UniProtKB/Swiss-Prot annotation:
One of its GO terms (cellular component) is plant-type cell wall. It comes from Arabidopsis thaliana (Mouse-ear cress). Glycans are attached at residues 47, 72, 161, 296, 328, 396, 481. The lineage of its organism: Eukaryota, Viridiplantae, Streptophyta, Embryophyta, Tracheophyta. GO terms for molecular function: FAD binding; oxidoreductase activity. This is Berberine bridge enzyme-like 14.
């Protein structure tokens, strides 16, 4: 069996080396353009449709490519990009993709780590949602309608301003993430122990289905609404907008970031062991992420946290539950919740206005690979020492350990399509970033990631080895033939026992498999 590193390279090279002659013929591009025009959307679609002949085509395509591995001139290009500005543009795109036999890729923020929202091995169209970014807040009801093309930064900024900094929303720490994909995969962040995931605070949605109908929660039915929350909406429909429930945040939160390589009088593995004991059981208002990274053969443990309250109460909790860290008053920074968003971006307090989170242009572009795991039992001290050793030998890889517990353990695994609830201590994100183009650098970094991932196998969930959909990972399986059997390989890892229900919903609402991609939910074909 080929290693997942080899599989990743084969898949990537296949995408990169498709010759120009294998691109869609001009006739197909013309046919699509004519088709969406004939459909006569309410708002003229011509100015929002880009084919390869359009001088702005590559700019539009690359604006939301967030992984430099796919930012080049040799990846297969879509037949067209529709930068939808009205729901009728989406209806026209769906109908014309069906008519012409084109696959559809739906992109809201472009953060699909393995590029599945803008890549394909067959003729395809990209439905780009970045123009659909409206945010309508109802401060009396503490709700908001958020279009899928809005970014988390735009949501946070508007919610804070509209609520006088007394409301927030539980979602990710990266302001550039698009709401469409982030929410539909679950949407986790540093308030999940208090309020759960984004999907646990979504109360309605407006979609366009496979028949180009505009539906809401009532008209789509509870099964499909269930699937959209954690099951990856791109397998079922196009989400126009989400109705979210805003959550209370205090006037001040307290943040800290303690980095140690043994310089606090405690061995880092001892601190990691203690973190395991308390991180998923501590006060629900407190989230402490442990990040492990290595340089010069030395592993650094970083404890980055946020408490929904003042520093005095935080120190009281830490002194009682985690005194080994030695957190002190000078390391605690009180700020508004909206300001904490910048802190998690490593922007020093007071050095930038909160409006910086409205910037859609990334601070930097990188080549990257991400993977995920779930830990359900404490890792022994010898196990931690082994992990630190493998990290010290693969210095391009870091791990972020994100604690669960709290509200996450209270919500049943079947409440939404997202199954990773009670029984999980923490989730791991494996990160490998590099800045040098070329196959040699990519192969080295992917190999390092795979070595660390394999070394972790004794300590993580099994049968299946669970994975987080928002950390998209082509290594765990791909469905190039649109079969149930291929889909189940990765499906049970992302969705566990919820996979079969997702297949049932998919088969009912999209029997022709219009919404498909390399890791979509498959249709169950009766025999």
């Amino acid at each position: 069996m080929k290693s997942s590193t080899t599989q990743t390279l084969i898949f990537t090279v296949f995408l990169l080396l498709i010759p120009t002659s294998f691109a869609a013929p001009p006739k197909l591009k013309d046919s699509f353009t004519q088709c969406v025009t004939v459909f006569k959307p309410s708002v003229p679609i011509q100015n929002f449709t880009y084919t390869q002949q359009n001088p702005n085509f590559l700019t539009i395509l690359n604006n939301y490519v967030r992984n430099l591995r796919y930012f080049n001139g040799t990846t297969r290009k879509p037949v067209a990009i529709v930068a939808a500005a009205h729901f009728t543009h989406i209806q026209a795109t769906i109908n014309c993709a069906k008519k012409l036999g084109l696959q559809l890729r739906i992109r809201s923020g472009g953060h699909d780590y393995d590029g599945m929202s803008y890549l394909s091995t067959v003729d395809f169209v990209v439905l780009d949602m970045f123009n659909l970014r409206a945010i309508e807040i109802d401060p009396k009801l503490d709700t908001a309608w958020v279009q899928s093309g809005a970014t988390l930064g735009e949501i946070y900024y508007n919610v804070a301003n509209k609520s006088n900094n007394l409301r927030g929303f539980p979602a990710g720490i990266c302001p550039g993430l698009g709401a469409g994909g982030h929410f539909s995969g679950g949407g986790y962040g540093n308030m999940m122990r208090k309020y759960g995931l984004s999907i646990d605070n979504i109360i309605d949605a407006k979609i366009v289905d496979a028949n180009a109908r505009v539906l809401d929660r009532s008209s789509m039915g509870e099964d499909l609404f269930w699937a959209l929350r954690g099951g990856g909406a791109a397998s079922f429909c196009v989400v126009l907008a989400w109705k979210i429930k805003l959550v209370p945040v205090p006037e001040k939160v307290t943040v800290f970031n303690v980095e140690t390589i043994g310089n606090r009088g405690v061995i880092p593995t001892d601190l990691a062991a203690k973190w395991q004991e308390i991180a998923d059981k501590i006060d629900n208002d407190l989230f402490i992420r442990l990040t492990l990274s290595s340089s010069n053969k030395t592993v650094k443990a970083s404890f980055m946290g946020m408490y929904l309250g003042n520093s005095e109460k935080l120190l009281e909790i830490m002194n009682a539950k985690f005194p080994e860290l030695g957190l002190n008053k000078t390391e605690c920074i009180e700020m508004k919740w909206i300001e904490s968003v910048l802190f998690w971006l490593s922007i020093p307090p007071g050095t930038a206005p909160t409006s910086v989170m409205l910037n859609r242009i990334p601070q930097k572009q990188i080549y990257l690979k991400r993977k995920s795991d779930y830990v359900q039992k404490p890792i022994s001290k010898p196990g931690l020492e082994s992990i630190f050793k493998i990290l010290s030998e693969n210095e391009n890889v870091s791990m972020a350990w994100n604690p669960y517990g709290g509200r996450m353990s209270e919500i049943p695994a079947t409440e939404t399509a997202f199954p990773h609830r009670a029984g999980n201590m923490f989730k791991i994100q494996y990160s490998s970033n590099w800045f040098v183009p070329g196959e040699e650098a990519a192969s080295d970094c992917l190999s390092q990631t795979e070595r660390v991932f394999e070394a972790m196998s004794p300590y993580v969930s099994k049968n299946p080895r669970e994975a987080f959909l928002n950390y998209r990972d082509i290594d765990i399986g791909k469905n190039l033939n649109s079969t149930y059997e291929e889909g189940k390989v990765y499906g049970v890892k992302y969705f566990k026992n919820n996979f079969e229900r997702l297949v049932q919903v998919k088969t009912r609402v999209d029997p022709d498999n219009i919404f498909r991609y390399e890791q979509s939910i498959p249709v169950h074909v009766s025999r």
